[in-house]
Design a protein with these regions (language model features):
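Iron-sulfur cluster-binding cysteine motifs and their immediate structural context
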Residues: 2-9, 15-40, 45, 49-65
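A broadly conserved sequence feature marking short terminus-proximal activation segments
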Residues: 1-18, 24, 236-256
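Iron-sulfur-associated redox domains of electron-transfer enzymes in respiratory
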Residues: 62-256
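Alpha-helix N-cap/helix-initiation motif
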Residues: 13, 43, 156-160
Length: 256
């Protein structure tokens, strides 16, 4: 199965210390037999543990941020933002909306609303089918792990769209003005790129890490921007979706 590369190795920085292999949950995607470790992308689940562990800066996530910045002023673009923005840009998530619109993004949507739709479908699936086990699937690394290494778990993956997919489909259906707009997806996850390619929705995968690095490099202060507002209805509970227990807290809305 061909998988888009989401993690790169800088050969000049890699010292072949194998820290990346030690923390990798699947091991097989790494080849440490040369002077530097290489990645077999078709076996990499894209979890990013190796990036965190590499003290030499030899591993980086691959996203579309540079391409997005090149094209944003010349294309019709909207952005959707993951609930994790409240953690990655603590206290400045609303200013991020204003910054995005200042560079040419026409509309910004909160994925928390899509997370509530996803959770609703989880609850409906459980009530209807009474499965022995349900594995939530917002994380593409988990999905890839099941597909590549534990196929016996595939039957337990929730047969529902992810919060990102729900949000994009909601925009296409209820906001016809943006039907032909490019969609920039802002999240902590490099592996999300694979999901968007599979469902053929989403054009730019932008990691919050690379976005924060850009702000630091260019001395952009988000607190100098006014608070912006999302262009979709606010979520009731799923703003905490990315925190421990966030999914269950959201599910309580649908379970009396």
């Amino acid at each position: 199965m061909a998988l888009t590369p989401v993690i790169s190795v800088d050969q000049e920085k890699c010292v072949n210390c194998h820290r990346c292999i030690a923390v990798c949950p699947v091991k097989l995607c790494n080849d440490g037999s040369k002077d530097y470790v290489t990645i077999r992308h078709e076996l990499c689940i894209g979890c990013g543990k190796c990036i965190e562990s590499c003290v030499h800066g030899a591993r980086r996530g691959i996203d579309d941020f540079e391409l997005f910045m090149q094209n944003v002023k010349n294309e019709n673009v909207l952005a959707i933002v993951a609930p994790a923005v409240a953690v990655s840009f603590r206290g400045k998530d609303k200013q991020l909306i204003s910054w995005l619109k200042s560079i040419g993004v026409e509309a910004v949507f909160d994925v928390s609303f899509g997370a509530e739709l996803t959770t609703k479908t989880y609850v409906e699936h459980i009530k209807k089918n009474n499965p022995r086990l349900v594995i939530a699937q917002p994380c593409p690394a988990i999905v890839s792990y099941c597909e590549l290494y534990q196929p016996e778990l595939l039957e337990y993956l929730a047969p529902c769209d992810s919060p990102m997919a729900h949000t994009m489909k909601m925009i296409k259906k209820f906001y016809p003005k943006y039907e032909n707009y490019k969609i920039a997806v802002i999240s902590p996850c490099y592996a999300k790129k694979r999901e968007y390619e599979e469902i053929k929705l989403g054009d730019y995968n932008i990691s919050m890490k690379n976005l924060a690095e850009y702000f630091s490099l260019h001395d952009i202060k988000l607190d100098t921007f006014e608070n912006g507002t999302y262009d979709n209805p606010p979520a009731e509970r799923a703003v905490m979706y990315s925190t421990p227990g966030g999914l269950m807290q959201t599910a309580e809305r649908f379970v009396p």
